[in-house]
């Protein structure tokens, strides 16, 4: 199942715990404003965090000229002619930008807390400390999907959203989670933005991701149940054939009364009806 990280982590599940600035405070505030404008264009779980930061200064946001996402690193964009870098330490190292020592970063990044850096041109200006949490309903549905044998593939522009983070927060195995690279992520966006031809709806939801997960899990369970019922019915037919053949060979067909046949059919009917319910 393909999902967007913004649906997996809706507003309120990613919380800003603190901001560490590097250099002057004015430069850090300017960098955060530029990053806020950039994330408003990009979207994703971090956009809600930056909306909280600049809630009173939305009219003062600078103009975004373009951006790219680097796999597992973060966003690099142009805002008012300046290069804004927003992402994990690996992104800054790849761009040869100095970042704090890993030991210093580890003081903030532990458990459900993660950090993300903001850089302007060639300088790191700020580090945001974020806490990620799992929505309870989404967590339950993801676990149910995993039990049904369905994996989840996430489209994200947030470098902190990794299979390991999703696995830890939602209580599922890392093997059940995948993350799209930038190329496939772009293809995903094209597909979801395309207009879908009109068709008869076999299932309808209100658009919530957990509702769609619930539907998919239910469909998988129904398919398994149908397969089990068919197997039980086949076993009943084979057993009936063997029993009749055995009685015919020994000339005991006269012992099959209407009551015995009725009870035999009633037994298998009870098995077919009750066993799927017990399985659930």
What are these regions (language model features)?
Residues 255-270:
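Small-residue-enriched core segments of transmembrane alpha-helices in multipass membrane transport
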Residues 66-74, 90, 107-111:
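ATP-binding glycine-rich phosphate-binding loop
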Residues 19-71, 94-95, 102-104:
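ATP-binding catalytic core of ATPases
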Residues 2, 75, 114-120, 154-155:
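Cytosolic beta-strand hydrophobic patch enriched in CBS
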Residues 1-21:
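Asp-based phosphoryl-transfer active-site loop
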Residues 275-280:
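Juxtamembrane helix-loop transition segments at the membrane interface in multi-pass membrane proteins
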Residues 79-81, 120-258:
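Conserved ATP-binding TGD loop and adjacent catalytic N/P-domain core of P-type ATPases
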């Amino acid at each position: 199942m393909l999902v967007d990280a913004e649906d997996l982590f809706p507003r309120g599940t990613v919380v800003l715990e603190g901001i560490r600035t590097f250099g002057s405070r004015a430069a850090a505030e300017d960098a955060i404003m530029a990053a806020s404008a950039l994330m408003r264009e990009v979207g994703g779980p971090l956009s809600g965090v930056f909306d909280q930061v600049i809630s009173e200064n939305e009219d003062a946001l600078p103009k975004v000229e373009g951006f790219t996402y680097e796999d597992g690193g973060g966003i690099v964009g142009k805002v008012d002619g300046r290069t804004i870098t927003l992402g994990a330490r690996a992104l800054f190292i790849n761009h040869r930008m100095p970042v704090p020592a890993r030991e210093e970063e580890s003081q903030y990044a532990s458990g459900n807390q993660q950090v993300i850096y903001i850089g302007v041109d060639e300088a790191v200006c700020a580090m945001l400390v974020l806490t990620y949490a799992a929505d309870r309903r989404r967590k339950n549905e993801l676990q149910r999907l995993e039990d049904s044998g369905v994996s989840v593939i996430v489209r994200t522009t947030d470098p902190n959203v990794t299979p390991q983070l999703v696995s830890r927060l939602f209580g599922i195995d890392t093997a059940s989670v995948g993350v799209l690279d930038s190329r496939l992520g772009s293809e995903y966006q094209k597909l979801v933005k395309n207009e879908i031809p009109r068709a008869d709806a076999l299932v309808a939801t209100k658009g919530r991701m957990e509702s769609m997960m619930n539907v998919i899990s239910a469909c998988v369970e129904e398919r398994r149940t149908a397969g089990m019922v068919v197997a039980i019915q086949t076993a009943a037919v084979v057993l009936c054939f063997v029993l009749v053949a055995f009685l015919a060979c020994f000339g005991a067909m006269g012992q099959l009364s209407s009551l015995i046949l009725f009870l035999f059919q009633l037994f298998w009917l009870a098995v077919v009806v009750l066993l799927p319910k017990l399985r659930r």
